[in-house]
Amino acid sequence: MSIEIANESGIDVPEEDLVSVARFVIGRMDVHPAAELSMVLVDLDTMADLHMRWMDLPGPTDVMSFPMDELEPGGRPDSPEPGPSMLGDIVLCPEFAADQAHKAGHSLEHELALLTVHGVLHLLGYDHAEPEEEKEMFALQARLLEEWYESLREARRRAELAERDARLLGKAGFTAPGDALGPA
């Protein structure tokens, strides 16, 4: 899976987290592993221009999605596997997101992760124009975001356990994996 990110916003953000959450959601939604995604982080003026140009709405917004290929999440188990495709572009505005994060009482990093999930879901055809669609999309968005956070916690826990095990084995005279087997 190829995920390109370009930060043109002038704001330092954890790009690796945005790639991580996008990759997680794409995987959870059964999108072909060779799919491609582009993410661009822009300033307020650029986002306002895009918002007016594509949505005919004044002022900036937090996230916009521009799908490329028609994709459906999941699919039938007996259907032929689709080939790689270009999901599309997600445009994020960190400055706008920072204001939203402050109002919501959480971090910019959390807001950008949430907006990335939101953007990927739009690329996959989810929308929130109607109340029922909004309910479905926002529930899925919340579930995927929580699952991503849980996967990070689990990875951190596994790394801590591996480090602890290596320390204990080292104290007992055993070498690290990849070294000669048996006691040192």
From Swiss-Prot:
<dbReference type="InterPro" id="IPR002036">
    <property type="entry name" value="YbeY"/>
</dbReference>
<keyword id="KW-0698">rRNA processing</keyword>
<feature type="binding site">
    <location>
        <position position="128"/>
    </location>
    <ligand>
        <name>Zn(2+)</name>
    </ligand>
</feature>
<keyword id="KW-0862">Zinc</keyword>
<dbReference type="InterPro" id="IPR023091">
    <property type="entry name" value="MetalPrtase_cat_dom_sf_prd"/>
</dbReference>
<dbReference type="Pfam" id="PF02130">
    <property type="entry name" value="YbeY"/>
</dbReference>
<dbReference type="GO" id="GO:0004521">
    <property type="term" value="F:RNA endonuclease activity"/>
</dbReference>
<keyword id="KW-0963">Cytoplasm</keyword>
<protein>
    <recommendedName>
        <fullName>Endoribonuclease YbeY</fullName>
        <ecNumber>3.1.-.-</ecNumber>
    </recommendedName>
</protein>
<keyword id="KW-0378">Hydrolase</keyword>
<comment type="similarity">
    <text>Belongs to the endoribonuclease YbeY family.</text>
</comment>
<dbReference type="GO" id="GO:0005737">
    <property type="term" value="C:cytoplasm"/>
</dbReference>
<feature type="binding site">
    <location>
        <position position="118"/>
    </location>
    <ligand>
        <name>Zn(2+)</name>
    </ligand>
</feature>
<dbReference type="GO" id="GO:0004222">
    <property type="term" value="F:metalloendopeptidase activity"/>
</dbReference>
<dbReference type="GO" id="GO:0008270">
    <property type="term" value="F:zinc ion binding"/>
</dbReference>
<keyword id="KW-0255">Endonuclease</keyword>
<keyword id="KW-0479">Metal-binding</keyword>
<keyword id="KW-0690">Ribosome biogenesis</keyword>
<keyword id="KW-0540">Nuclease</keyword>
<comment type="function">
    <text>Single strand-specific metallo-endoribonuclease involved in late-stage 70S ribosome quality control and in maturation of the 3' terminus of the 16S rRNA.</text>
</comment>
<dbReference type="InterPro" id="IPR020549">
    <property type="entry name" value="YbeY_CS"/>
</dbReference>
<feature type="binding site">
    <location>
        <position position="122"/>
    </location>
    <ligand>
        <name>Zn(2+)</name>
    </ligand>
</feature>
<dbReference type="GO" id="GO:0006364">
    <property type="term" value="P:rRNA processing"/>
</dbReference>
